[in-house]
A protein has these predicted regions:
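Juxtamembrane and boundary regions of transmembrane helices in multi-pass small-molecule transporters
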Residues: 71-75, 90-204
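Membrane-embedded alpha-helical segments and adjacent helix-loop junctions characteristic
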Residues: 2-95
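Generic alpha-helical transmembrane segments of integral inner-membrane proteins
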Residues: 20, 24, 59, 63, ...
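Generic alpha-helical secondary structure signal
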Residues: 54-58, 130, 206
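Residues within alpha-helical transmembrane segments of multi-pass membrane proteins, especially transporters
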Residues: 24, 28, 59-63, 67, ...
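Structural signal for alpha-helical transmembrane segments and their membrane-water exit/capping regions
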Residues: 1-3, 22-33, 136, 167-176, ...
């Protein structure tokens, strides 16, 4: 058996509360609609081709990843529905012979980028925080948020720049130009309406916490 102190000792870990805070932020980004607004704004501005669409999705993942400690929630809750909407708009279904029109390329790229952003930010995945906590106990050195970022940002950004282009070359979509994407993104932004107080609050808290971390 274990003592009450041992049973509750985990609640004293700073990394545990960092995970809890980041989970709250991730729900705020998803529920407020801020994540979708960021994604559709980038698509409206840069999504004139399938390659640029991939980079817009990559930038979306990069922007929201510091406050979403689950790459599954980030990919499945924000990025995946957007990729699905874009694919269906171009009649690209996951089954049958239309997947290669654009959906397969965007989905493969989004999945790849989702795993890359995990390496850039400590709070992009709860597993990162567990690793640093375990490392601190075993080796007596606790890696800070800033130290993790310094170590991961250069290789991570290089991979983010190269991978959409690399996948585009080895697994190219049939549709190269996507002028309709901007109009689709604008339609989605119109449906979201003006930016809300909740989105502004989440954005301010998000930026402040990143600076404080």
């Amino acid at each position: 058996s274990i003592t009450m102190v041992q049973a509750l000792g985990g609640y004293a870990e700073a990394n545990v509360w960092l995970i809890v805070a980041a989970v709250f932020f991730s729900r705020g980004i998803i529920n407020s609609g801020l994540g979708k607004r960021i994604a559709y704004t980038l698509i409206r501005s840069f999504g004139t081709s399938s390659l640029k669409l991939a980079y817009a999705l990559a930038c979306t993942d990069l922007i929201i990843s510091p406050a979403t400690p689950s790459n599954t929630a980030r990919g499945g809750g924000i990025v995946f529905p957007i990729v699905q909407n874009i694919s269906l708009a171009f009649d690209s279904e996951p089954y049958g012979n239309t997947a290669r029109r654009i959906g397969a390329y965007l989905m493969t790229t989004a999945h790849t980028i989702n795993t890359i952003t995990v390496t850039i930010f400590l709070t992009a995945c709860s597993g990162n925080l567990l690793i640093t906590s375990l490392g601190a106990k075993l080796f007596g050195y606790d890696i800070s948020w800033w130290e993790w970022f310094q170590a991961g940002v250069i290789p991570g950004v290089i991979c983010m720049i190269l991978m959409p282009w690399f996948i585009y070359k080895i697994y190219p979509p049939e549709i190269k130009e996507t002028p309709e994407a901007a109009a689709m993104a604008q339609k989605e932004l119109d449906a979201l309406g003006p930016i809300t107080k909740a989105e502004i609050s989440v954005a301010i808290i998000f930026v402040l916490c990143i600076l404080l971390w």
